[in-house]
Amino acid sequence: MDASANNHGKLNPVSFSFIRFYILAFLFFAANSALTIILPLRSEAAGLSQAEIGLMMGAYMFTCMLLRPLAAQLLGKHGPLRVMQWLLLLHAVTLVLFMMGDVEAYLWLRALQGVATAFFSMTMQAGIVEKLEDKDRAQGLSMYTLFTMVPSLIIPILAIQIWESSREIWFTVLMIGLAALPLLIGYRVDQPRRTVQNQSYTLRDMFRSFRAIWRSTPLLISSAVMLFASCVFGATATFLPLYMVSTGHASAGVFLTIQGLVVILCRFVLRKKIPSDGSWNTWLIAGLLLCAALGTQMLALLEFIGPLVYLSAVFSGFALALMYPTLTTYLSFVLPADSRYVLMGMFMSSYDLGFSLGGLAMGLIVQNSSYSTMFTICTLLSVVAMMLVVIFRKRMESGNGERLSTAN
């Protein structure tokens, strides 16, 4: 057992075991960061249309969304350690197939990559919930999500260099490295063999849990907020570079760098500030949604505000950094233990669905209007989510006192 484990077998979020967790998360998501750059370039060079490229890239998130609840079901049946071993093997095989296959196979391989990601994120977050003290849970989830974001700052630069070099050997080396290293680090990672659920969770039980979303105000409101927010995040990630190139008023590279740095700094510096007692903080969530709204509205006004648009990166980065770990930590406390991971899987699916819709639905809006109109609609989505949070304030905060007394 890790030397930093306490008498109850719980670990410290900065212990050696959890540093391995975070490194594993970085390596796993580095593969997607690389493929997100290289696959569209390869596909376009091979003659695929923009619609075909969009379908191929969207297959990743869509498969993720569909399989998260199933991943949670298998966690309860087989335990995080066994599921982790299976998914790392699947991940490695998928990357090797990317190396060997041509563009016609990319759609199915992206879907297969989405399968591995659905299981990976559920398994990692189950491990954090099971292995950390309640008071450290928010810090652990924040650090985990931080390390899933870092590859998006570093790996794309490497991927572009590989593409521009036109040497297939470097792509092969990258894929082999990103297939082998997670296996070496993660195959024996310190994951629990069983979860609190610790039971075989049948499909009937899983569909019964789906109905619970309408009966559980915390799950319903959290999922709705995440759906709206991730739609905004997805639209920004998909269309911001095209928007800035088309207007010529700002640099997408500078904007994304500022946003990425804000995300990393917030998730590290503020990791201990995220509520880790199961309490709902209405004004924190509303404030994050306000930041998201300000960020997209400044983008909508890009042609009028010029360089001031980089403030949008700060607002958007702040919302992006704290929204997901805050809501995930809250739900990990309030959901029933016997179906916690299936219900959390449904919540995470709302993120995947929103992100996908941000590219698909907002793309249709751009085609029929303008980028400015699309970002204004994103602002309205954030405002609607903020109104939901305020309207349901009393119901969401009704259990705060009881959970705080239990925590103390």
Residue ranges and their predicted role:
Residues L67-G79, W163, C266-W280:
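Helix-to-loop junctions at the C-terminal end of transmembrane segments
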Residues G58-A71, T257-V269:
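Central cavity-lining transmembrane alpha-helices of secondary-active solute carriers
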Residues D2-S15, D190-S222:
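Juxtamembrane intracellular "pre-TM" segments in multi-pass secondary transporters
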